[in-house]
Amino acid sequence: MLYIQLETREMLMSKIFKLYQIVIDKQLSDLINTEGWDCHIDALSYRNASEGDPTFGIINDCYTHVADLVCDDLDHCFEVGNGYGSADRFVKKTGVNRTSVSVGDLIEDEDGLLHLVDSIGFRNVTHLKTTPHM
């Protein structure tokens, strides 16, 4: 269990948030560079999410659970996810390279509410949640 790894009382009182991202690997990156952003469903979803609309990515199951963040709130998730504070609060999933929290990413709280990292702040997009694993 994740709590066993945590040592301070403050961290034990924090919540666990799930970070979801649309992963662009080298192969997809090469394809995007050759054919443009409309070349693949993940690329199009990534572009749309970066512009504030995660609908296509959520509906088409393009998001991957890349990390758990042990934080107090969404703002704290943004800080921890971008390298500020204790590295123990950022628990990446196996096989995932170090990542940062960016516009277009999704953060799910312990209540199951889904939040889009927007250009300024966060937006609740729980109503778009349709995939069983999210």
Predicted segments, located by residue:
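Short, compact, well-ordered microdomains
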Residues: 96-131
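Conserved ATP-binding/catalytic motifs of P-loop helicase motor domains
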Residues: 134
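A short beta-strand micro-motif
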Residues: 5, 15-24
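Short conserved micro-motifs at the rims of enzyme active sites and ligand-binding pockets
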Residues: 29-31, 128-129
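Catalytic phosphate/metal-binding cores of nucleic-acid and nucleotide-processing enzymes, i.e., regions
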Residues: 12, 23-29, 36-58, 113-116, ...
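Short, conserved turn/kink motifs that form compact alpha/beta structural patches or helix kinks used as
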Residues: 47-106, 110
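Short, Lys/Arg-enriched N-terminal segments with co-localized hydrophobic residues
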Residues: 1-12
